[in-house]
């Protein structure tokens, strides 16, 4: 992987689902929407001064969105921060940097 580049897409893990669960309130505040279960489906990572996670989530039957979540380096402020999102995605949309 190229430093600063995106990794290959990988199936979501329990750790990625936990990240989605933790940033869900931030997403709801930013979109002014309330979501039921957000299911992590796939993700990519980008190593910066910490890690950006690009996560595809299913937010309903055929509703998908992409989340960008920043996790700082260990020992720094360890809060997860939702730094971007894209709504109106479908299951076949590729995760890209945004």
Swiss-Prot record:
Tissue occurrence: Expressed in the skin throughout the epidermis.
Which SMART domains does this chain map to?
CY
What are the entry keywords? Answer: Acetylation, Cell adhesion, Cytoplasm, Ichthyosis, Protease inhibitor, Thiol protease inhibitor
The yes or no answer to whether the keyword Acetylation is present is yes
Write one Gene Ontology MF term: protease binding
- Give residue numbers for sequence motif Secondary area of contact: 46-50
Q: Name one GO biological process term.
A: keratinocyte differentiation
Signal peptide boundaries: none
One CC-aspect GO term:
cytosol
Tell me the superkingdom of the source: Eukaryota
* N-acetylmethionine modified-residue sites: 1
CDD domains in the record: CY (cd00042)
- PROSITE patterns registered for this protein in UniProt: CYSTATIN
- Disulfide pattern: none
Site label Reactive site, positions: 4
Q: Where in the cell is it found?
A: Cytoplasm
Q: What does this protein do?
A: This is an intracellular thiol proteinase inhibitor. Has an important role in desmosome-mediated cell-cell adhesion in the lower levels of the epidermis.
Disease entry from the Swiss-Prot or TrEMBL record: Peeling skin syndrome 4: A genodermatosis characterized by congenital exfoliative ichthyosis, sharing some features with ichthyosis bullosa of Siemens and annular epidermolytic ichthyosis. PSS4 presents shortly after birth as dry, scaly skin over most of the body with coarse peeling of non-erythematous skin on the palms and soles, which is exacerbated by excessive moisture and minor trauma.
Protein family membership? Belongs to the cystatin family.
Task: Spell out the protein name for this chain.
Answer: Cystatin-A
Which gene is this protein's source? CSTA
